[in-house]
Amino acid sequence: MLWRDDTPVGRLRFYANGDTALLDGLVLLPEAGGSVAAQVVSEALVRSAALNKRHLNATYPAAYIASFAATGFQELRRRTGMIASTQISLPLSPLPSSLRVRQLSHDDIDQIGTLLQRAYSGGPDNLHPDLAGWRAEVRAILDGRFGPFIPECSFVAEHTLDRFHLAGSIMAHLERNVPRIHHLAVAPSFRHVGLGQYLDLKTMQRLQELGHSTVILYVTLGIPAFNLYHRLGFIEAGPTYIEAERKINV
């Protein structure tokens, strides 16, 4: 919590992971004013340096752009939350006969990590510097560290002629008791055949069968998937927020 005298004016979370400090969950009451946001940024930089961290990564609402930009933060991407009903009338369109969709398992972790690295390469969602980072994130999702994993609603797509690389994948878990789609990804060579829409619809239909009426996701603004989600009935459910990074001089 953030306090002004005896009055709470906001909240945030500050923690460390490896050589990086992280600041997220920043919410300020309107009466706090822009000066409080600037103080938060300055204090986070001081604490990061005191911890000998090399980077400070921050996630914050777009309303605080000026305070972070003024201290040298470089914007990585803009994201927004979206929500949709799982009761959707669109049918599952047939896929090419060479593709097979099945429920994913822990044995798929390495291949899903490879798929995510290939799918996000060169784009704003390419957040891990190496394959190990992607595989670690997939393992964390399946192990429930983002919220209880829902295996019945998580799928991979395989190509009959390539057993070493996945064509697509989608994962789902609970976030505050609401299903969340995490990393809908399609390999570059299998785009524009309807695979992304197929996986998304399959997950939404399975969630509906399990009694979940809504599903959420977070998407980077400006990527093609944003339009896909709109077609599937997703609407923006919150403000745009920024993910940014600043190097720390220690």
Which residues are covered by each model-predicted region?
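Conserved donor-binding loop and adjoining core beta-sheet/short helix segment
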Residues: 1-46, 168-179, 187
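A conserved beta-strand-loop-helix scaffold within acyl/acetyltransferase catalytic domains
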Residues: 12-19, 125-179, 184
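Acyl-donor-binding surface of acyltransferase catalytic domains
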Residues: 29-99, 242-244
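Glycine-rich phosphate-binding loop
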Residues: 31, 136, 190
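Conserved acetyl-CoA-binding loop-helix of GNAT-fold acetyltransferases
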Residues: 33-46, 186, 192-209, 230-231
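Conserved hydrophobic beta-strand within the GNAT/NAT acetyltransferase core sheet
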Residues: 55-59, 181, 215-219
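Conserved active-site alpha-helix within GNAT-family acetyltransferase domains
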Residues: 60-78, 197, 221-238, 246
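A short beta-loop-alpha structural element at the N-terminal edge
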Residues: 100-115, 121-125, 238
